[in-house]
Regions:
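Long, contiguous binding/interaction regions
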Residues: 113
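Short functional micro-motifs and their immediate structural scaffolds
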Residues: 81, 94-98
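Short, flexible, mixed-charge glycine/proline-rich loop motifs
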Residues: 61-68, 78-83
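Cys/His-enriched microdomains
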Residues: 71, 87, 105
Length: 113
């Protein structure tokens, strides 16, 4: 379960941002995860809740938004969203594609007071 290490990293980023902004309490952490990142949002939320106990993020809400998978075709150089890992370019049919977005996991922003 890599959600535990991701939750730890998310918590560290949120705590640092809150401290730099002079906030005492984190209310919401907004996270973006790629559709092919393998992140299970409910597991990530459970891990974040567990790891944030006793910190300014205790009780904070974790809002996870899934980012669609975007690939660039190496043949026609167009970008497209795909839903399957075995997809080809929807424009030219080439299987020569490179993922641009879809595996990321990052803190987009936080709400704190």
């Amino acid at each position: 379960m890599h959600e535990l290490s991701l939750a730890q990293g998310i918590l560290q980023v949120a705590l640092k941002a809150a401290q730099q902004g002079g906030a005492e309490r984190i209310m919401t952490v907004y996270v973006k995860t790629g559709a092919f990142s393998g992140v299970v949002p409910s597991y990530l939320d459970e891990c974040f809740t567990l790891m944030s106990k006793g910190t300014p993020a205790e009780g904070a809400t974790l809002e996870v938004e899934e980012v669609p998978v975007v690939v660039r075709c190496l043949e026609c150089e167009r970008e497209s969203q795909i839903e399957r890992a075995d997809a080809c370019c929807p424009h030219c049919g080439s299987s020569q594609i490179r993922m641009v977005h879809g595996r990321e996991c990052f803190v987009d922003r936080i709400e704190a007071e």
